[in-house]
Every structure is written in C-alpha cells, then in structure tokens.
Amino acid sequence: VPTLRALQADGRVRYSGITHYRADAHAELERVLGAEKFDWVQVNYSLAEPEAAARLLPLCQDKGIAVMVNRPFADGALFARARGKPLPPWATEVGCASWGQFFLRWIASHPAVTCVIPATSKPQHMIDNAAAGRAPLPDAKQRERMRAYWESL
C-alpha cells in the first residue's frame, strides 16, 4: 500500500482499489477497506453469491467506494440452474429478454454497484450483455421480485 500511495502522489496512478473473487474473502476486504482508503473494490456478487450485500456493499456505499462486480454469472452456475426454465412472464417489465440480462440487471440495480464486468469470448453473449444496460434499472421492489422468482426455481 505505501508503494501505491507513492505512485498516486507522483501522479502515476490515479485510482487505487482491491479485488477478490470469493465470498470467504469478504471479511478481509471489509477489514482492509476499514483501514485504508481505496477508490474501488472488485468483488463477486450475484443471485448465486449474494453475500456481499450483507456488509461489504453497504460499507462501500457508506464510504463512497466504487464497486465493480466480477463473476456475475458465478462461473456459469446461474445459467446451469436456469437451463430449460422460462423467464418470468413479467421479465420484459424489468427490461429482460434473456437470463443473462436478468442476472446482470439484478446486480447492476443494487445501489452500491457501479459496474458489472461479465467475461465472455462469444460476440453474441457480449451483445446480449450490453443490451442489459439499455432500459431503466429495476427498483427495489422489482429486485425483490426477481430474487424471489430466482429462489423459486
């Protein structure tokens, strides 16, 4: 951290942050964010891995720390569970035309989330992922409806 701070003071680094991809590291991320000032954190958060919403996302929101969400599809676990199952009949009301959009829009609509970074090597998936950002994001009531539907599958 001292080296990073020196690089920032020198103007060679503008923003600093920390990252992890597992829920069992959230407590350590919280500890570090409580002790050091960072501009952003990158963390896993999804319908399959919602643990960050309990403490880490509120902490970031309170401290003005930008949140980048990695692993939004939980390494494909969300798609595996949704395979063969229809989107809810009201999916278009929350701007979703695919399961990928459903998952991304649920994440992006959390008030602490700044951006979601899904990884893909398939152009069609990239197009679908980008479409998730076209409509207004779900509100708190819609997010809860999305979560409840997901839990019912």
Language model features with spans:
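Beta/alpha (TIM)-barrel catalytic core signal, keyed to glycine-rich beta->alpha loops juxtaposed to Asp/Glu
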Residues: 1-153
